[in-house]
Amino acid sequence: LRFFEDSAPNRRRARIFMRYVSTRGEAPDLGFCDVLLAGLARDGGLYVPAEWPLLSPEEIRALRGLSYPELAVRLLTPFLGGEIDERTFARIVRESYAGFRHDAVCPLVQTGANEFVLELFHGPTLAFKDVAMQLLARLMDHVLAERGQRATIAGATSGDTGGAAIEAFAGRDRTDIFILFPHGRV
């Protein structure tokens, strides 16, 4: 992970070159878009960032009061490694969460003194997996369109992952999805 200072005075703009490595250490390092489409690494490992971006105390304070989409853009942009421009990414994020039933997307609700619950059920299928799946589907569609490619996704599940995936990928231009459910065991 490398940061470069912008030449403009009093303005720091980091250009980040993010690479992802396999947890098993036997697969080639990849950038964000390749990892997004690869899923698992060739060696069966998971791809993780080689290094994690750090936030200064000032940057953390600046997050206060942001909407969920604004917060997502601010925190996730470094992981893109410059492969998707920030304006496009912000649009994708806004579209991903526009269909949620609560303006806050995932509201933090106080239930008592020093007790809070993060509500993750306001997505289209009411499953917590909507939070990630809605963004994943749109990011994949964007990257596939940029590359002039299509993808077919096949999955099997006995829970709410399938419904969240089907809903997220429904109507996407570059993906088809097939989910298998065990008969009578969902």
Describe the predicted segments one by one.
Residues 5-17:
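Short, Lys/Arg-enriched N-terminal segments with co-localized hydrophobic residues
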Residues 3, 17-186:
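PLP-dependent amino-acid enzyme catalytic core
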